[in-house]
Amino acid sequence: MKAKRFKINAISLSIFLAYALTPYSEAALVRDDVDYQIFRDFAENKGKFFVGATDLSVKNKRGQNIGNALSNVPMIDFSVADVNKRIATVVDPQYAVSVKHAKAEVHTFYYGQYNGHNDVADKENEYRVVEQNNYEPHKAWGASNLGRLEDYNMARFNKFVTEVAPIAPTDAGGGLDTYKDKNRFSSFVRIGAGRQLVYEKGVYHQEGNEKGYDLRDLSQAYRYAIAGTPYKDINIDQTMNTEGLIGFGNHNKQYSAEELKQALSQDALTNYGVLGDSGSPLFAFDKQKNQWVFLGTYDYWAGYGKKSWQEWNIYKKEFADKIKQHDNAGTVKGNGEHHWKTTGTNSHIGSTAVRLANNEGDANNGQNVTFEDNGTLVLNQNINQGAGGLFFKGDYTVKGANNDITWLGAGIDVADGKKVVWQVKNPNGDRLAKIGKGTLEINGTGVNQGQLKVGDGTVILNQKADADKKVQAFSQVGIVSGRGTLVLNSSNQINPDNLYFGFRGGRLDANGNDLTFEHIRNVDEGARIVNHNTDHASTITLTGKSLITNPNSLSVHSIQNDYDEDDYSYYYRPRRPIPQGKDLYYKNYRYYALKSGGRLNAPMPENGVAENNDWIFMGYTQEEARKNAMNHKNNRRIGDFGGFFDEENGKGHNGALNLNFNGKSAQKRFLLTGGANLNGKISVTQGNVLLSGRPTPHARDFVNKSSARKDAHFSKNNEVVFEDDWINRTFKAAEIAVNQSASFSSGRNVSDITANITATDNAKVNLGYKNGDEVCVRSDYTGYVTCNTGNLSDKALNSFDATRINGNVNLNQNAALVLGKAALWGKIQGQGNSRVSLNQHSKWHLTGDSQVHNLSLADSHIHLNNASDAQSANKYHTIKINHLSGNGHFHYLTDLAKNLGDKVLVKESASGHYQLHVQNKTGEPNQEGLDLFDASSVQDRSRLFVSLANHYVDLGALRYTIKTENGITRLYNPYAGNGRPVKPAPSPAANTASQAQKATQTDGAQIAKPQNIVVAPPSPQANQAEEALRQQAKAEQVKRQQAAEAEKVARQKDEEAKRKAAEIARQQEEARKAAELAAKQKAEAERKARELARQKAEEASHQANAKPKRRRRRAILPRPPAPVFSLDDYDAKDNSESSIGNLARVIPRMGRELINDYEEIPLEELEDEAEEERRQATQFHSKSRNRRAISSEPSSDEDASESVSTSDKHPQDNTELHEKVETAGLQPRAAQPRTQAAAQADAVSTNTNSALSDAMASTQSILLDTGAYLTRHIAQKSRADAEKNSVWMSNTGYGRDYASAQYRRFSSKRTQTQIGIDRSLSENMQIGGVLTYSDSQHTFDQAGGKNTFVQANLYGKYYLNDAWYVAGDIGAGSLRSRLQTQQKANFNRTSIQTGLTLGNTLKINQFEIVPSAGIRYSRLSSADYKLGDDSVKVSSMAVKTLTAGLDFAYRFKVGNLTVKPLLSAAYFANYGKGGVNVGGKSFAYKADNQQQYSAGVALLYRNVTLNVNGSITKGKQLEKQKSGQIKIQIRF
């Protein structure tokens, strides 16, 4: 039984189901748990399944990976199967395999793109079958196996197929065992476009009276393709084995619904062919050849009822050879000239007879001819070779007896490395097909009306002019398959508008010639225009088609309605013919436009349907329809090109190729979505050019079955676009020039643009996507462009990176540059009234000094230096701006050691809020400041606000902030001047006068050293008023305009009533606090002056009586004099523009300059200065626990920093690390009161702070905690314990918060495990050993740390009597530390400890009271390490501790259990200093006194004691100190 041609609603399923064994194995049944779109993409080599792809993983609808579509093999190219029906597979340039029972469908096939593309007519890729070549043509198909074996044909086409390269057929024969060998054939895959069904339980497919249960019908046959893998097992039922046939599945099995579901889930994309796929191919991957091969054609299936088995007819080599032998005339050999003579349909080339065709009907009569050697072929007459072609295996010239001789045939095949010079023409309308890797040179004379299609190799158009100087190589040329190159020897060889790039395109080599296109006709991204001529440039000019500007100019034709309620006479009226070429057609009260290639007699869409394959609905009214039709036509006229200009790097020789966009109107639009790598220039003289990426190609969703969320803006014609699945494009040219009000834009998914850009005459340049920009998508199926200006979703916007633009920009004469989601790397020179705008996602990296007339920022980032970091910077840039507005960020690279850095200079006007980001070169800065932002020449700065990102920047050892004076914003740190003489702070009036006379700053990168600034900047550790200001500034940045107004009020001296009520209240509150502070400071100053005088007198007396402890000890610099305060200082006006508000304006007058000629004291000598430290411990008042609170007194508290100044020379080793003299080093520049002198914690960088914090944490946990717990253990052992031996173990957990003026607040968590053994030597003597292991985790400010510590201690305890005892201990340990900021550092230190304790045990009934006192010496060695670029030297730390403790216990029994509650209190007076040197600057930290309170209980049962206790430790640097301990002891 044979198939009839499938038509909609014309297949009678009952005929097929009436017979269990039917030959109509035509269609696909697929699983339902995988998105249908995946099967579609797989069939069309789209999505992730492009040719050669190896990532073929498949996920189900729940996002779970269910395996690979193909295992360990590259993706196959399905284009060898015809694009519409998928029933004819090209295995030879002229032959395709199918089945003979589908002969009704084997007549015309299309390869490459689908029908209906705007740029290429359907007939261009049409191939007509001239002979089906049925296998055993007289043997009809039947139900027996033998009938199936003969169901096979190999059709011959009228032309060589150029769109696709043939696939090699299997050479393994027809035996099944070969194909069961997985070592040879590892994978099988099928494709088909028959009836489409999907397995779905509970539904059924019905046609006529027959039903297919658990099947849902999706589409009729030949509408679209599905591909996947067949069932896994080959011919389970051995009775179906036949040589030459291969089946998959079990013919004897009838699948239940569940079994079918399992069968369809054998592989990720398993599917089952049903109605509509007869003749569709099966492919196999041949591992021996490492390639896909054609295996067979689909001929048989087991029906809807079984759904269990399918079969293919294996390629028949002997049959193919027989056909080719019949179609080949033979081979012409020998050099020299050969004449081709004809007699009717017979001809001879020398002795070789060649059959010819008489007309198109007997084209199969034409034979192929092969030419070997080198020679000349002369056509004596016109040759109609029909379906015969010419195969050249040598160099040949083909010419006619005269210039008008023509040749018609299947095509020309030129072997690789060979060249044929073609000097004959082909008939008008005939298409000359060129295949083979060799070269064909067209070298005829005059005008040739024939056509050419280049499928492979090279074709050179070198046609000569005739006597009338007319030249035309071909009337039309197509470049297809991606394998061919067309070379033009002159620009007049062909009308460029008659050239097109078909399926997968190819190369057009302009070869130094200039070409002008109205539109470059192209199907897909395979098109490529190049210039391989390195001696001559080529210019490609695009003008675009004229746009329709008047909708009333569109023509309308009314078609007689199908019905009319008011007029029944229309039944009897004659039908008027419908004319072609009208713009609109009116019928049934609706207006329609005919699609390109649409049929006039086709039905028009109704019932809400907008379009079908032939018509598009345009509206109900003529005005609406004409407007829609005009937009529709204009969109079709967008000059879109999806190909690539020139060669990618390394893929050919790029000559100079220029592009010129000169639209026929200013509104003309051009869309480029392929990319470019030009050695030439892109010019836009008129029109609008848009560069864009493109969506990843996906197969059309004809039945709306895809479960993925598609982009609705581009879903017309069943197109599938996913908003976050696009392909990036790159564009490169020497220059891009835009002028005459033209525009040049880059949209989404343009990853790189490399070119210098020049814009003049009101031109607009928009680089990088921004919301509201046009997004355009060109359909590969139709060539139609759809554009949308709606904002992208966050998902889409985040799916592509910012466009990187490499090149300089020159703007003149009102030109404008707008950056969207883009990063510009280059210089900008803006002249005239040019404008530059940066948006939220914009970045600009300067590669040199730049000048911008008008710069507008919208939370944008400008990197003033293109160096990757400060270390690699060898030059610094200045940007000059005439007018600055908006809100943004400026990023600087600086070298404070050389007083160099990037700079912003604003000349005429400035408004907005700008954050400065600074990165300094490695090395310790020796400058106290550096100009960053200069707006001093701007008259009105009331709306300009400049702040430092994160409020500070770490440069070397110090932390800098900014200071603004007279419009100049500069880096500033009050400690940076330490170690150098500092002038007295001028009064506000004097400061104002000096600023007024300040010399003009230079514009270059070399920045003059600024004058001293004495007002301390805000910092993260400032008081509550400063913190409120900082938070307000942050909110202002987010809210932009509100922020600007708030900052304006905070800085401006002439504030008006327009301030918001909240800001007024804040300023008034600050003023009140300032007044209170002034009064307090005045009183404190007087008291401090008296106190200081007394202290100086005591110090002088003490030093006079003190003897030096070492011969080499140096003199100590006396403390600086007390500052002099005056209330007048607080009332004076301050002209500074610092953002720290009113508090920053409080500048006390200093008494005299700080004396700076002092000598340093080696840190190790501090260990011998216990007396001096005790004096210091009592010298100062204790500091408030809130380190942020502003104190009016100088920083003389024992928490205060010891030093932040720079040593003149580095220490020779860690033990020689020097510390600056106590208070002298502490004061920043002039000895200022606390309100102006920031604490060391606020002034040091992250690395310095981390080093200080780690050193303090190590001191506390290693030296102090370990000794304290050992002392407690010794004290709590009673004399009764001395009579027994014991072992014990304890585990202690700590949670601590630290705060000090020496370092910023941090927290620490620590666990400590101790194991000990106690041994009794006598009733009065005990000894013991303790092994301690601890692990600490620290969370520093923007850093972290980890310590592991191991220490061993020995102790002895002797009882003098029943009450008094004396104890001593000694120990040593090792500390391993890891510090993590933005860099890592690992280093080790060692520790030693020794202690002596005296105590007494008082027993009153059941009460025990144990007072004790002792002394302990602990020392932690030095360390030397690198933290990033900073060299860190940590001095050894020695702590001398005086302890006093009191333990209170009460003992009682509960049965055999003794319960002993415990209370204890201890005081630790710690004397010790440590130092950290970072980059040559020294900083100190101290151990402070601490109190500890504990409570717990001991449970004694026989010889086992369990202790549980918790403790709280208090100290000046310890905010929250809690710990808990569990201890178990066994006596024996």
Curated annotation (Swiss-Prot):
Residue(s) at site: Cleavage: 986-987, 1018-1019, 1121-1122
Domain notes from UniProt: The signal peptide, cleaved at the inner membrane, guides the autotransporter protein to the periplasmic space. Then, insertion of the C-terminal translocator domain in the outer membrane forms a hydrophilic pore for the translocation of the passenger domain to the bacterial cell surface, with subsequent cleavage.
Native source species: Neisseria gonorrhoeae
Skewed-composition ranges (Basic residues): 1107-1116
Compositional bias ranges of the Polar residues kind: 989-1004
Region (Disordered) location: 979-1136, 1166-1217
Domain annotation Autotransporter: ranges: 1280-1532
Role description: This protease is specific for immunoglobulin A.
Active site as annotated: 278
Catalytic reactions on record: Cleavage of immunoglobulin A molecules at certain Pro-|-Xaa bonds in the hinge region. No small molecule substrates are known
Protein name (Swiss-Prot/TrEMBL): IgA-specific serine endopeptidase autotransporter
Gene Ontology biological-process entries: proteolysis
Major enzyme class: hydrolase
